């Protein structure tokens, strides 16, 4: 008798995706982050669902409903902090996953890469609208500042902002629609993730060498299921440590003050995972220019496959490209630090230099070094 997992229409799909999937034998722990992102998504949807049962998307009760969740609901504080810190873990895994793709040339699978960029944008949108929901000071002012950036669009900007707000300022209508967006977007992310996997399984996984590994494949189960379980345990351990010992480490104290349109916080800043983009936005003194730089800082990922000049796919055997890659990582960490600092000397100039270096590395230096490496190898 043939195994049910190979004949049943539904089981067959799962079998081909997670059990009998031929996988390169040499993929390292950097390939764990895809499954960890799936785990993060499931955790966020589940904790979010339980939070939504007790939350009220209304300006007069939103803040107190979050306080009620933390004080009166059984393990409400735990669910709330799992959800908040789960978002941070999500972005850590996301950035590691993208970094892996950049380093090993996984972006050459263009459909998978483009769906991935779309996923990144959707997750960022979800995190942004979610941050508004507790209706603290930073929620309110973050929403005001970021949505107001759209007013930089010529001609239709102001109308567009008022349309998104549902009035002339961030108010009840804004909170209600942001809650609706925050509820629906994770399901759109789930659908996109399925398409992402579909395209990946058309080509098969890349590997650290960047060389086709069709002659050296092993089944996904048990080899990589056990490896993914180890990664999942480490992720859960880190998340639990963060949630139970320092739940507010990555949050902003201003968000424990109820939203007040009459009182602006001294330093308006987003959550840590948006700080690099926020630093790029602030480094340009022109509003429209800043918005364009902010957009380009993320959308530049779409152009990465077109900027590939090296004859080698992976950076594994390219020491000069490796140097530039780690310079880019250091630059992004610098931008993240600058985004959290006030707008004053010397942070302004450091932010501007780091922003220039970011675009220079991706658009000019890395493609140039790829060509130089080809010459050195006489290719």
Swiss-Prot record:
Positions with a binding annotation for a ubiquinone: 201
Superkingdom assignment: Eukaryota
A single MF term (Gene Ontology): ubiquinol-cytochrome-c reductase activity
Subcellular location: Mitochondrion inner membrane
Cofactor note: Binds 2 heme b groups non-covalently.
Residues binding heme b b566: 97, 196
Binding site for heme b b562: 83, 182
GO terms under biological process: mitochondrial electron transport, ubiquinol to cytochrome c
PROSITE patterns cross-referenced by the UniProt entry: CYTB_CTER, CYTB_NTER
Cofactor: heme b
Membrane topology label: Multi-pass membrane protein
GO cellular component terms, semicolon-separated: mitochondrial inner membrane; respiratory chain complex III
Secreted found in the keyword field: no
Transmembrane segments: 33-53, 77-98, 113-133, 178-198, 226-246, 288-308, 320-340, 347-367
Keywords of the record: Electron transport, Heme, Iron, Membrane, Metal-binding, Mitochondrion, Mitochondrion inner membrane, Respiratory chain, Transmembrane, Transmembrane helix, Transport, Ubiquinone
Keyword match Transcription: no
Chief location category: mitochondrion
Biological role: Component of the ubiquinol-cytochrome c reductase complex (complex III or cytochrome b-c1 complex) that is part of the mitochondrial respiratory chain. The b-c1 complex mediates electron transfer from ubiquinol to cytochrome c. Contributes to the generation of a proton gradient across the mitochondrial membrane that is then used for ATP synthesis.
Family in the record: Belongs to the cytochrome b family.
Extra remark beyond the main annotation: Heme 1 (or BL or b562) is low-potential and absorbs at about 562 nm, and heme 2 (or BH or b566) is high-potential and absorbs at about 566 nm.
Subunit structure as annotated in this protein's UniProt entry: The cytochrome bc1 complex contains 11 subunits: 3 respiratory subunits (MT-CYB, CYC1 and UQCRFS1), 2 core proteins (UQCRC1 and UQCRC2) and 6 low-molecular weight proteins (UQCRH/QCR6, UQCRB/QCR7, UQCRQ/QCR8, UQCR10/QCR9, UQCR11/QCR10 and a cleavage product of UQCRFS1). This cytochrome bc1 complex then forms a dimer.
Identification of the protein by name: Cytochrome b
Source species: Sotalia fluviatilis
């Amino acid at each position: 008798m043939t195994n049910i997992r190979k004949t049943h229409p539904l089981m067959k799909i799962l079998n081909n995706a997670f059990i009998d999937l031929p996988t390169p034998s040499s993929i390292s722990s950097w390939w764990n982050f895809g499954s960890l992102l799936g785990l993060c998504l499931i955790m966020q949807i589940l904790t979010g669902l339980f939070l939504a049962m007790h939350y009220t998307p209304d300006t007069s009760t939103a803040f107190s409903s979050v306080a009620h969740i933390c004080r009166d609901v059984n393990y409400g504080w735990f669910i709330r902090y799992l959800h908040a810190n789960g978002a941070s873990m999500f972005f850590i895994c996301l950035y590691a996953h993208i970094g892996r793709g950049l380093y090993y040339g996984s972006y050459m699978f263009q459909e998978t890469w483009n769906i991935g960029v779309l996923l990144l944008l959707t997750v960022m949108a979800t995190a942004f609208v979610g941050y508004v929901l507790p209706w603290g000071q930073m929620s309110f002012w973050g929403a005001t500042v970021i949505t107001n950036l759209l007013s930089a669009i010529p001609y239709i900007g102001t109308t567009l902002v008022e349309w998104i707000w549902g009035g002339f300022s961030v108010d009840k209508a804004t909170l209600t629609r942001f809650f609706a967006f925050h509820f629906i977007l994770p399901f759109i992310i789930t659908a996109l993730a399925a398409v992402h996997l579909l395209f990946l399984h058309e080509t098969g996984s890349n590997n650290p060498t960047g060389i086709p590994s069709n002659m050296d494949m092993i089944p996904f189960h048990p080899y990589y299921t056990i490896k993914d379980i180890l990664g999942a345990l480490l992720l859960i351990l880190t998340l639990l440590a963060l949630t139970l010992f320092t739940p507010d480490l990555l949050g902003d104290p201003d968000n424990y003050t109820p939203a007040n349109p009459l009182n602006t916080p001294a330093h308006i800043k987003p959550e840590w995972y948006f700080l690099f983009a926020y630093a790029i936005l602030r480094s340009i003194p022109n509003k429209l220019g800043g918005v364009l730089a902010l957009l380009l800082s993320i959308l530049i990922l779409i152009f990465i496959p077109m900027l590939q000049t090296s004859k080698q796919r992976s950076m594994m055997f390219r020491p000069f490209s490796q140097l530039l890659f780690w310079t880019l990582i250091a630059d992004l960490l610098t931008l993240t630090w600058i985004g959290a600092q006030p707008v004053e000397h010397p942070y302004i100039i450091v932010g501007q230099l780091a922003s220039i270096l970011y675009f220079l590395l991706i658009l000019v230096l890395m493609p140039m070094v790829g060509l130089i490496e080809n010459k050195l190898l006489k290719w």
